[in-house]
Every structure is written in C-alpha cells, then in structure tokens.
Amino acid sequence: MVNDMKIGFIGAGNMASAIVGGAVKSGKFASNDIYVCDINEEKVNKLKTELGVNAAADALELINSVDTVVLAVKPNVFASLLPSVSKNINNKGTFVISIAAGKSVAEINNLLGSNVPVARVMPNINATVLEAMSAYCCNALVNDEQKALVEKLCSSFGKVVSIEEEKFSIFSAIAGCSPAYAYMFIDSLARAGVKNGLAKGQALEIAAQTVLGSAKKILESNEHPWELVDRVCSPGGTTIEGVCALQENGFEATVTSAVDASYLKDKSL
C-alpha cells in the first residue's frame, strides 16, 4: 500500500529539501518513513533535526532501507552513481523516481537495468513554497500504486500532471522557466510604482500580491483569461489604456517568443 511505503532521497539539495519538507508538513507522509543521504552531512542533519526524517550513511544503506528511491542529485552524477547501486535496486525491485533535469527514463534504465520501474518527475522552483507545478511520466513497469505514490508525493508540494515524455521540453519552457518571467513582470510593475512615487518594498508587495491573486482567480474560475481582462477594463478607463499599450508593444508576442526560445534550447540539449 502507498501509505506503507518508505521513501529515500539520494541528495539533500534545495529541491530535495523542499520536497521532503512538503511531504512531511502536508501530513501525507510520516517522517519516520523518509530516509535521506547526501555527501554533505550538514544538509542531512538539518533535515533530520527540523523534520525528524531518517539519515542514511550512504546510498546503499538508504536503498536497503526503502521501497522507493528518489534520485535528487545533479545529472552529471548519474553515470557514476547509478551503476554502483544498480545491483541493490534490481535485487529489491526498488521503484525509482528521478527529479534530475534532462535525464530521460530510457537513459536511467540504461544505467540501472531494463527491469527497473522508473518515473521521471519535473518539479519547478516553487516547490520551495509548496506551490510547484510538476509533471511526471513513467516506463511501462510502473504500476498504478506507484503512480499514485508519485501523485501523492508531488501534490504535497504543489500540483502535478501526467504527460508524455516528449512533451517535457514544452512543459519545462512553461513551468520550469516561467517563474523567472513572472519575477521580471512583478519587478517591472514594482519599478513602475517606484517611478510614480511608491517605496520599492511597498510597490513590490503590491505587485506580487496582485499577480498571486490574479493567478488564483484563473485557477478557481471557469472563465477564459480574456473574459477576466474584459471584466477589469471599463470603457474609456485606465485599464484598457494599459492593455492597449501592452499589445502595441508586443507583450503577447514577446512572451510567446520567450517560451519558444526556452523550448528550442531545451530540445537542443
């Protein structure tokens, strides 16, 4: 059963720490069912102290203690790490979840063996505030219970969707890269506020909260974004002037170009 599974994280960096924090703080996973190891003992001890998770001395000890392993190390570590633990993973029939960017399910299976159930998960930076948008895909060996585990884990630090692996590049261009675009937009709003007399800190709070509320409105409404735009724009009013200025300066085309550029770069890697 999903609730009985023990999960181990190889790697305790920022993303892994955010995921572990979400898993425990959401109440969806018990801290004593989670194991963590990292070459940086300080990071592991911090998670152990703050969240009550188990510390493993190394990857092999961790694998022998859990049912599911989350690979949360840098992609360039895979070539040396995975062959060194493949025997233990195969012997136990361990379910492997990777959150490493740019490593396909096939590449992971090539390093671990073709009989290993593997899921690939792509969270975004907003996992650190438990508002991530994640996507996942699996090989044919992943069963329904394991898929449910992936969704339960990812939903503990945000929202999650299942997509085909070939769509990961466009998902990355939107969910992975757009936080940076959103930060730029929010900062631009704030700087415009400063230009017109607001203090920077106050302007930033106003801009960020407004964007947060607008995003929430879209998620909680069945209305198309342009319907919401029309509702805010009064005839001859201030908002329609700003909307027209954005259109005249290529706002929509610029956003599309940014996504296209990120998508093409991801495909070329």
Descriptions of predicted regions:
Residues I34, V44, L62, I108, ...:
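Small-residue helix-packing motif on alpha-helices
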Residues M1-N64, E131-A132, V194-N196:
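NAD(P)+-binding Rossmann beta1-loop-alpha1 motif at the extreme N-terminus of oxidoreductases
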Residues E107-P117, M133-F171, Y183-E220, K265, ...:
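Internal alpha-helical scaffold of NAD(P)-dependent oxidoreductase catalytic cores
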Residues L51, A59-Y136:
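Rossmann-like NAD(P)(H) cofactor-binding subdomain of soluble oxidoreductases
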Residues A119, F168-A173, P225-D230:
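Short pre-catalytic strand/loop immediately N-terminal to key active-site residues, enriched for Gly-Thr
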